[in-house]
Swiss-Prot record:
BP terms from Gene Ontology: purine ribonucleoside salvage; xanthine metabolic process; XMP salvage
Subunit text: Homodimer.
Similarity comment: family membership: Belongs to the purine/pyrimidine phosphoribosyltransferase family. Xpt subfamily.
Binding site for 5-phospho-alpha-D-ribose 1-diphosphate: A127, Y128, G129, N130, A131
Record-given protein name: Xanthine phosphoribosyltransferase
Gene: xpt
């Protein structure tokens, strides 16, 4: 997706330790035109599948998931990083955040993730695949079916794709970062 790649090279910031900051257009301040283009691309990539629900984890995955759900005319559900007292029939799992270097217990109500669901998971980043593995666990607990996972940005050098594909998961990434060494952003063509 050329528009996204151009924006990453133009406005993305690299930090030591393999961190790519895209908060000026994806996960703090958002560019709605870019987000619509991201949604359109996920719709194209997963056209012809039997997806009937979009899923993500709060917070940075919500915008692309909403846009994708809107364009596909499908409901969107997100796993919460804190369990509210009002949640019933909660499914939960532990997820490690690479960026924040901490564990979260993520929860979702089984009222909104059921055996009837064919799920497309959408998120901002694929690094080591920790969040995605947590989602796979929640989907298994619910009895739903995972159709595939779509990521705005994949950091290929952190091997999350390999982890997921070894489990039979279809992975689609819109921009694949090959390297961030010396804080230079290298994107796969």
């Amino acid at each position: 997706m050329q528009l996204l790649k151009k924006r990453i090279l133009q406005d993305g910031k690299c930090y030591e330790g393999g961190i790519l900051k895209v908060d000026s257009f994806i996960n703090h301040q958002m560019d709605p035109v870019l987000m619509k283009s991201i949604g359109v691309e996920f719709v194209r990539l997963f056209a012809g599948t039997n997806v009937n629900k979009i899923m993500t984890i709060e917070a940075s995955g919500i915008a692309p998931a909403i846009m994708t759900g809107y364009l596909m005319d499908l409901p969107v559900v997100f796993a919460k990083k804190k369990s509210p007292r009002t949640i019933q029939n909660a499914l939960s799992t532990t997820v490690h955040s690479f960026t924040k270097d901490r564990d979260y217990e993520v929860v979702i109500s089984s009222d909104f993730l059921t055996p009837k669901d064919n799920v497309l998971f959408v998120d901002d980043f694929l690094a080591y695949g920790n969040a995605a593995l947590g989602v796979i666990d929640l989907i298994k607990q619910s009895g739903a079916n995972l159709v595939g996972m779509g990521f705005i940005i994949e950091k290929a050098f952190q091997n999350g794709r390999k982890t997921l594909e070894e489990r039979g998961v279809r992975v689609e990434s819109l921009a694949i970062i090959e390297d961030l060494s010396n804080c230079r952003i290298t994107i796969k063509d």
